[in-house]
Amino acid sequence: MNGSPGLHLLIEYMLMEKIANLDRKILDIIMRNARIASKDVATECGVSRAAIHQRIQRMIDLNVITGSGYNVDPKVLGYRTCTYIGVNLERGAMYREVVPELEKIPEIVECHFTTGPYSMLIKLFARDNEHLMELLNDKIQMIPGVTGTETLISLDHSISRVLPVTYDD
């Protein structure tokens, strides 16, 4: 088979019953607690710790698991304003040119190419309104291809959760 080894593994993985039931159970456990010990996952799943390690590593290799880490309250770091910004582009196709410029702005934590009234929707954190104005006026709106922005300030973060994972017991 031609192509990258990763692609070959991904196709092989997809040919399995999408994601095996045990893998789904592992995902459910580690998505709820990324710090859980492999031995505890193994106990809950009724398999060896080595099996858990191998399955997690395989899911990482196949980009089923794309990251792990800790969630830190942005306010503790001095970022008090959470903002969603609708960005309009000259042409939607400019998305690929604009994204690398947005990646240079560390306060931007998410970027989505969207349907609807905006070409893109970005989420960023600013220290305060003055900092937000600097980011908008001196950085985002200066990117070639950006024709306009609309800013929505989040007043409260109400829901934060992981997606549900279904599996057979």
Can you annotate each of these PLM segments?
Residues 1-169:
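A compositional/biophysical signature of low hydrophobicity enriched in polar/charged and small residues
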